[in-house]
């Protein structure tokens, strides 16, 4: 017997009201690529000057770009890259391949993504599937060989943008960069230029000197925006995002000032303005007001890190607690082996069965993926590799959550941590 067709309950009808606030909220999102970039003309000109030789068939210098989050690094590179692609149609062909290394963070993935992007550029959808390197299953040498073949067939210049390049190095070491910075010596009809983008100003410290010398032929630092510059950016986006007279200069100025206090982060300013508008929209208001900005800031500043630590499984908390103990003793960087040794002591003190070496390593990787800790792989040549672990930001909030758990308060081995917590160190 056929079941009756599903009948909607109309759950969302009460939320679909005539929109009086937004005409296009998408222009306030990080993914939006503006046609103009206020207060980044100097940086645009610098990158364009470095890449200009590509239009005459030469290989441009590799570039490392630094700057804090929300300083316009990615948007600027994409803007210049698009201009170069368009103008190169009259000269020597150039293409931009943009990879986000927060997710594409292994040598296999990087090489495969570049090859698949380049080979699929001029193919129809059905042919792209046939020419795709699988997500797993090939030896890295095979992927590298296929990448060289793809580049040779494509010809021209491929500008490889490795966004958040520090994440790739910390996860997988610098072998990927070593290979990419030397790939031109294996090519005849094609060339590669690399642009690395990082918000970690100490990123270079993680690189082998040979890789660094090849990668950082040119370096640019993007300064934070000030309040006036952020105000200009918000005005530009607000004209497209909101209906006329919905947002006042006072509201835009407040969003800009708040974001300027957060290291001149344009992303933060855009988020604050967008969430303020969404709160006004839900309220049924006709204007975005200061109270909406204040509420939006509270929403955005909800301590997601504390919530994340609170919901960790017990074993993950024990691993994290072991790192906190080491940090409390003055250590700033730990190896996975030393963390596992302390973990076993803490687990024994808590009368908890210790997990295997491999499982603890998995938990360390999970903590890294959550952003609670940061890991980097350090190569020792013939002696192999070591995973180094550190806290990128102060541990006060993490320690507070852990030590509010009664199980850890009663653990004798953690008394130094408890004393630090009580002192507020």
Curated annotation (Swiss-Prot):
ATP binds at residues 71-75, 225, 237. NCBIfam families: orc1/cdc6 family replication initiation protein, PRK00411.1-3. SUPFAM superfamilies: P-loop containing nucleoside triphosphate hydrolases, Winged helix' DNA-binding domain. The keyword ATP-binding applies. Keywords: ATP-binding, DNA replication, Nucleotide-binding. This is ORC1-type DNA replication protein. CDD domains: AAA, Cdc6_C. GO terms for biological process: DNA replication. GO terms for molecular function: ATP binding; ATP hydrolysis activity. InterPro entries: AAA+_ATPase, ATPase_AAA_core, Cdc6_C, Cdc6_lid, ORC1/CDC6, Orc1/Cdc6_arc, P-loop_NTPase, WH-like_DNA-bd_sf. The keyword Nucleotide-binding applies. Belongs to the CDC6/cdc18 family. Involved in regulation of DNA replication.
